[in-house]
């Protein structure tokens, strides 16, 4: 397996994704298939599920002759990837030779840019890292396709600001959706905050006929998922009283990062 990322914006997305996932689990299992990189990860509380698909066309180069499933320490991998932000190219390599259990992470630079920087005394050097793989048992969950009652698209930066503000008033978010408005509520022992979002202010909005949603989620987990707002300028949110909430970032090139969060269940 060998892949390359050359675009600076995509390097930031790729690095940012694993910076986020290191807070979910102590390890990450990556499935390299012939036409994609696939990751499924449950957070430590088992409340959130990440489902990530990055197609081969998203990368500058992607080559995988057979399916490879490898697991790595999430924190160490995120630390190594973070160094890639200083470089022009990230290369990941893995060879299934049985006795070699390593992933190779190479940070390379555009020669023309490097030569120009060297003239200014600012040359950057290529870096070559190795990280040991770990042996764990991993089961992939089947995620059924469902029809949600409410779907809307909103600016990812804006919804992060809203969730963060609500989180200062309480740990839980109550969402009410109707044909004309989305109402977000959070409260503590002595204070309460309500934020109304008119549907006209959304990029897209769809709700099933005569449907009204009233459901609650953990704001702590929602804020954690929305830390990945750099992945895309917009986020799609899907709701139903019968299914987990879906938050989906479109990365382009038929690639996406999806987060599922189970609703809060309160005792009567």
PLM-predicted stretches and their roles:
Residues 1-22, 27-168, 174-268:
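DNA polymerase sliding clamps and clamp-related checkpoint/processivity subunits
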């Amino acid at each position: 397996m060998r892949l390359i990322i050359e675009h600076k914006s995509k390097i930031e997305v790729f690095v940012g994704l694993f910076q986020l996932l290191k807070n979910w689990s102590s390890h990450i299992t990556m499935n390299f298939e012939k036409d994609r990189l696939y990751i499924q990860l449950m957070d430590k509380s088992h409340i959130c599920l990440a489902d990530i698909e990055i197609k081969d066309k998203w990368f500058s180069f992607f080559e995988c002759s057979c399916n490879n499933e490898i697991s790595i320490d999430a924190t160490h991998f995120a630390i190594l990837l973070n160094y890639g932000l200083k470089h022009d190219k990230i290369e990941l390599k893995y060879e299934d030779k049985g006795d070699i259990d390593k992933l190779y992470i190479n940070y390379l630079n555009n020669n023309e840019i490097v030569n120009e920087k060297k003239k200014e005394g600012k040359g950057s050097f290529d870096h070559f890292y190795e990280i040991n793989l770990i042996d764990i048992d991993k089961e992939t969950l089947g995620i059924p396709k469902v029809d949600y009652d409410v779907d809307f698209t909103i600016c990812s930066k804006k919804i992060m600001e809203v969730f963060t503000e609500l989180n200062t008033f309480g740990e839980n978010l109550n969402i009410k959706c109707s044909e004309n408005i989305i109402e977000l509520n959070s409260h503590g022992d002595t204070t309460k905050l309500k934020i109304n979002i008119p549907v006209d202010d959304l990029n897209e909005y769809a709700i099933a006929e005569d449907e009204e949603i009233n459901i609650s989620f953990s704001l702590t987990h929602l804020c954690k998922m929305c830390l990945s707002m750099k992945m895309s300028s917009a986020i799609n949110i899907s709701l139903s009283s019968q299914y987990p909430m879906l938050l989906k970032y479109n990365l382009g090139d038929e690639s996406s990062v999806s987060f599922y969060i189970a609703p809060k269940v309160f005792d009567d």
